[in-house]
């Protein structure tokens, strides 16, 4: 089980993306006459390409009194440009299998497009068009303002720990531009005017304030010609105003802040220290310190607090910026544990490092981890592009993707002791104590909308000459890696995925039958058993396993779901012997120590307590329990079942599934089939036994629409999950269903998104889809909407479903859907892990691997009639299970206009 994460951060640092200093990227770098920095990076591993443009403007540049403006503007950049209509980007990209997105940081705003490599001209044309000019109308400003406010309420105001996270990323900074949250404050977002948007674009969205990276399967000459033709004529702008210089300020005493949160079930403690910028000479030592404390199961906080069952989460994080950064402890205790104990233990571990230093072995482990994670970070075209952008932005050298590792290799124990003393003093702390409260959450704020909207002529800074995208390039074929299937004499299936360009080894064992094969009076047993496979064998303790693999930069993992148990090992290829040795030991000799069982029980009880505060979790849990009543898929874990499960139950269940004829071993990486089979035979040939096949009970029949409302007082949003029983997991109906859902709610340009998000502004995000388990899955539509529009939003969903059931797709729609899915195919298999997961899914569902080779043909053969048949065969709104989580006093009357409502109390 992944530990409950209070705060999920994607930290793209040079340390995390660095490999070996003697490596070099195949790149060209130059500057156009208008000041645009261009970096072209060639990697022909897959026929994909990423166009990634960073503008040097972030939340630090928000106008005074208008926090969140850079974020609001990022949304506005998708509202149209001289040659692209409102929301037209997705309608251009999705039919060719491409996608586009953006994000705002403190220091910059990134826009990226990923496309099959022959569609590079389209992606470049889109970015050039919106660099030149932007369509800004009062209508689309008001619409995006509503979406941003909905996002803010969903991500912070209506979410457990959201207020604390917002405080953590702003309050500790002494640097004034960093004290404004990137997402903004609702009152400030409501102040934005059209003139502000146009001025912001003209000030910051100029070529001399941007860096364009094109990474992937490219030809340098052809790409340079496209870039020069499309971006070269855009005029240089005035140099944007510089931010004030950061001057460190000594904090005289610690700051203590109590945050009352009506949505949490578990208190939390956050401790933050301001630290120097990422490029500062002391940053690597602080980063290594954070990794020594909390990266990996063999880290110090993991051993001190998580292994002992005291903490659900005990992490040390680094927040890096061009200006000052942060070092932070994030602590969430298990049920009944005093947070003061966790806080004191964290300080003691820090002091122990100050007093005793860090052994070279731990430093070597950190460097090994940086290296292995760096390899994975460069595996995709987008990962490569983002790593190059980061290296160039912070260090002025894209090759720092590799050379940056030297900063980390130079870190000594003395350096770590010195920076801990200098930057992590008691007086430097900002301590946030997050506690439960019975107080009501503040009411939702309505987005501002102009009463009188006047038609306006576009006011573009520049219009590029090319009114249509250049034609596509010649397409490159996607070459599957060699995938072989073999069966050992004992019945063990062995699949080898040969990927010689990836210097890693990935080993995964999957057993058929997870929760579906466990005693149904013990829900949660499969999850506990799965998690504990890696936590001790007859020869090794959990720390022995974690220490051995993490010392070489690898990792182990395991888990249990509805249809399977799985365990895996990842390592660099030079450590293949260790990887197989650990995998075999865990598979064959897992012994489920009593202390680990009790630790897992405590963690799961605390995680369930925390998750029950999340409306999305409650909605999904309630939907599944009602839809699959009496079936293992609906058998939700409870506090009572967690208390009842014993070690004997765990051992008996694992032993019932742990047999070679019930398993598949998937080997991926820089290894041949012959080598893989030799290792498999060496470690698993003597394994014996036979497992009972999994059987499934009949599914419940649902007749008539059911509306269930889970009361969550104070909730500012309504979270819904609606749907019905769907498709058998191995069915070929997957392919027409995929095409149908692509149009209905599977993409950003889909009907549901365009209607309910873009036209109505009811939600930040909505989507629909089918699940494909080993038995029969579901069809479901999911969203979070404003309280005042829950009934209208659901009515729009029903309208779109009726439309796709009664009106054939247009020629353009079905062609775009099929072509888009075909184009997406290569991105679904861009990494080694994509292949492993696809093979595992096929095996667990009983699908022949040859379907991968036929996949594109099946999609291309889907007709309009197939789409109508699927929509009517598998979507039944008259029999929907409708689950809504929200404040009953605000939304129950609305829901009653749709039918009888059953009110449920939150668990």
Model-identified regions with their sequence ranges:
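Short, conserved secondary-structure transition motifs
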Residues: 149-155, 246-260, 367-377, 571-572, ...
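Non-catalytic, conformational "gating/processing" segments within enzyme and secreted inhibitor domains
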Residues: 145, 198-230, 428-429, 621, ...
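M16 family metallopeptidases and their MPP-like homologs
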Residues: 41, 46-62, 68-72, 87-131, ...
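Alpha-helical scaffold elements lining the catalytic groove of polysaccharide deacetylases
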Residues: 188-193, 197, 642-645, 650
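A common structural junction motif
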Residues: 128-138, 230-238, 347-358, 585-592, ...
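Positively charged n-region of N-terminal signal peptides that target proteins for export
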Residues: 1-4
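Proteolytic maturation boundary segments
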Residues: 18-38, 219-260, 268, 303, ...
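Bacterial N-terminal signal peptides
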Residues: 6-15
